[in-house]
Amino acid sequence: RQRQMCIRDRDMKTFPIGGVHPSENKLSRGSAVEPLPLPDLVNIPLSQHIGAPATAKVAKGDRVLAGQLIAEATGFMSANIHASVSGVVKAVEAVPNGQGMRQPMITIQREGDQWAEGIDRDPALKRDCDLAPAEILDRIKRAGIVGMGGATFPTHVKLSIPPGKKAEALIINGVECEPYLTSDHRTMLEHGEELLVGVTILMKAIAVEKAYIGIENNKPDAIAHLSLIHISEPTRRS
């Protein structure tokens, strides 16, 4: 049986009354995502996810490589954390976060651009995945992938189907929850192929035959773009 992703222009039911509908201020919707230069000093929180904070696996004075595991998940509801830069660990201590609250972080002084062994930096898109479902989930868990929403829910937990249960379909959330956000929009436009390949891999991971991508009607270009890719490359649906 062929797996299918559903990309349709379909109106969904909404609340009949009530709700708050703030004005959209998608000021950056037409601007491409650009990489920022690497900072000289980074503070990496040990809690970038809902659940238990990760446990630091490095100490002051250690040299680390980009992509290296520097903090390990503690329990099922937790997530691994990796170094975003190569350099020297300057401290493992509580540091004020963006909200002014102190939380444990690993501070790294950047030096060079060396990567951990086994990190695949080839930009070419790999469309084939011969991993078993359990292996896919293990890769996601080891990578420390979490949701980008406010809850930052560990992705391997989301994809863990309870024993005796079976999922009917995979739902991908392409809806932006705040008036100024455009990151989902730009991702669908700039990385549509990668997105659809990722969807097929997740479908395999949870053994479903259908996937739905939810996109707001204020993103007609994203809907058209993903639909075009989906139609022109049907092999990506299998």
Task: Give residue ranges: language-model regions.
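N-terminal, Lys/Arg-enriched amphipathic/low-complexity engagement segments
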Residues: 8-57
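Short, conserved secondary-structure segments in the cores of folded domains
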Residues: 54, 60, 77-80
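Iron-sulfur-associated redox domains of electron-transfer enzymes in respiratory
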Residues: 77-83, 91-232, 236
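Active-site-adjacent bridging/hinge elements
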Residues: 41, 61-64, 169-176
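Short, well-structured beta-strand-loop connectors
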Residues: 59-72, 91
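Acidic, glycine-anchored pre-beta loop/turn
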Residues: 5, 58-64, 96
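Single conserved hydrophobic/aromatic residue that forms the stacking wall/gate
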Residues: 1-7, 229-238
